[in-house]
Structure formats: structure tokens, C-alpha cells
């Protein structure tokens, strides 16, 4: 099953270092946008080692398909967690996604089974990103913020 979009909202947590320079903001070319913001009211806390993120959980076909399409900014401490009813091969693409992301595939035990860097795509024929192992969850974070690796367990 292909998802029509990938999205992520970046989260800032007390354990994430703040950038010294606003030009380091992820997904932003404007100093007007904060790197770290309060999480949305419906955000769920998620930890990977010492890092904490606040993620928007999407668990319906419609919300998974929308993902982070057309969002032009994500705070560094936020992300999006795609939740599926079972563990299976999961394929994603970046159609109309404007922010570079890291896609993190998690198995049913919430262990990281794959991590791939994904670039924005504004054309019709976007590359497909397929996890190397079946996954029940796929986490999207701003590209480069994750300090975890394959084999780490995510807490949520």
C-alpha cells in the first residue's frame, strides 16, 4: 500500500540542543519561524534514547495519506507517527512534501528496523521509500535530528 504523502512536524524537547543560529532552523528559510515550539494539544510524547519528540499520530487511511503534505516548516522537536493495525511492508513517497525528512520504520515492538533520508518531491513521479523490514509504525522527523540507529527501541 502506498501512502500519498509523507509528513512530519519537528518537535523540540528539553533534551534537544537549541541551534545557536536561526539559519540552522530545519525546514525554514525565515528567521521568523521558531526552531522549537510548544507541541500541538493532541501530540504524543515519544523518546529515542536521550531525545524527546512530540508527535502527531496519524492512524486512519485519510490522515496517513495526507501526512505532512504542503507543510513548509516543522519545529525540531516535533514529528509525525504513522500507526498501522499490524506489521507489514510499508512504502512511502514524498509527493508535495516540502521538508527533508528522515523516515524511521519501527516493528511491532517499537524497535527501529530501518532509517532512510527522504527529500522533498514536487513532481508527479516521486521515488518510493520502502522499509527494509516489515513495520507497524513509521516515524517522520526532520532530516538529521535523530541520534538513534537501527536496533534502538522507541518509547511511546
PLM region spans:
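C-terminal motif of bacterial Sec signal peptides marking the signal peptidase cleavage site
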Residues: 8-10
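Sec-dependent signal peptide recognition
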Residues: 1-4
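Compact, glycine-rich, soluble single-domain proteins
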Residues: 12-156
Amino acid at each position: 500500500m502506498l501512502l500519498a504523502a509523507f509528513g512530519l512536524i519537528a518537535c523540540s524537547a528539553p533534551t534537544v540542543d537549541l541551534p545557536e543560529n536561526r539559519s540552522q532552523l530545519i525546514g525554514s528559510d525565515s528567521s521568523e519561524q521558531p526552531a522549537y515550539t510548544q507541541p500541538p494539544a493532541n501530540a504524543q510524547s515519544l523518546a529515542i534514547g536521550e531525545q524527546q519528540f512530540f508527535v502527531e499520530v496519524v492512524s486512519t487511511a485519510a490522515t496517513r495519506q495526507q501526512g505532512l503534505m504542503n507543510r513548509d516548516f516543522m519545529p525540531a522537536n516535533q514529528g509525525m507517527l504513522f500507526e498501522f493495525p499490524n506489521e507489514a511492508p510499508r512504502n512511502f513517497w514524498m509527493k508535495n512534501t516540502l521538508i527533508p525528512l528522515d523516515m524511521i520504520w519501527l516493528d511491532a515492538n517499537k524497535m527501529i528496523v530501518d532509517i532512510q533520508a527522504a527529500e522533498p518531491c514536487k513532481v508527479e513521479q516521486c521515488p518510493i521509500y520502502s522499509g527494509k523490514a516489515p513495520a507497524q509504525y513509521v516515524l517522520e522527523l526532520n532530516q538529521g535530528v535523530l541520534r538513534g540507529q537501527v536496533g534502538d527501541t522507541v518509547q511511546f
